[in-house]
């Protein structure tokens, strides 16, 4: 998909979670139906909800969950997902509750009535919640990766090379006018190394 975006000049906005659900219709053609169903079942087993298309059975169009809960509330998975989002082609967009590693809000769902399924990922954060969240490593680390991306000119019209030496290994190097960025990710262990170089100064993040 990253190669297709690059080669076809496809312009995208990249999101993990958003104010609505995590869309499923866009997965058709990218993943087999069996894999899509397995993803649905996994998210539901972790407390998420699934919405059918206009009430039709077995024709699902979104799952409702925070991205953090969909990943099993695993900090390493969340941070790798954020790194991949930031290094993929397109403009990254970050939903506030994902940044703060928010959990499924089933109480809000119960209060929301018929359309309450969307409230699972719309928890209101107080100033105290935000202050406490900014002390969490998962929040600070996401912010650090975002700052690395924002400060590096390689992502603005730069050249991307997609390297995949093995099914679970992905390398995404960017380069533009001396600015460089590189992500090396192991999808099986969730380990990754992100490096950006701008004006002779290098920033490195590893997990």
Regions found by a protein language model. Give the residues of each.
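Active-site and adjacent substrate-binding regions of carbohydrate-active enzymes
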Residues: 1-207
């Amino acid at each position: 998909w990253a190669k297709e975006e690059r080669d076809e000049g496809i312009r995208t906005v990249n999101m993990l979670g958003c104010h609505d659900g995590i869309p499923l219709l866009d997965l058709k053609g990218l993943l087999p139906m069996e894999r899509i169903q397995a993803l649905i079942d996994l998210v539901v087993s972790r407390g998420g909800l699934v919405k059918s298309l206009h009430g039709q059975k077995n024709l699902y169009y979104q799952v409702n969950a925070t991205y953090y809960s969909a990943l099993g509330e695993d900090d390493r998975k969340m941070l790798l997902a954020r790194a991949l989002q930031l290094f993929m082609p397109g403009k990254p967009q970050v939903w506030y509750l994902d940044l703060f590693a928010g959990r499924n809000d089933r109480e809000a769902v119960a209060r929301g009535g018929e359309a309450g399924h969307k409230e699972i990922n719309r928890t209101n954060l107080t100033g105290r919640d935000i202050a406490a969240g900014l002390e969490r490593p998962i929040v600070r680390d996401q912010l650090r990766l975002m700052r690395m991306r924002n400060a590096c000119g390689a992502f603005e019209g730069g050249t991307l090379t997609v390297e995949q030496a093995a099914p679970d290994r992905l390398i995404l190097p960017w380069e533009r006018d001396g600015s460089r960025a590189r992500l090396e990710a192991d999808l099986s262990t969730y380990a990754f190394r992100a490096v950006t170089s701008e004006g002779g100064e290098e920033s490195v993040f590893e997990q």
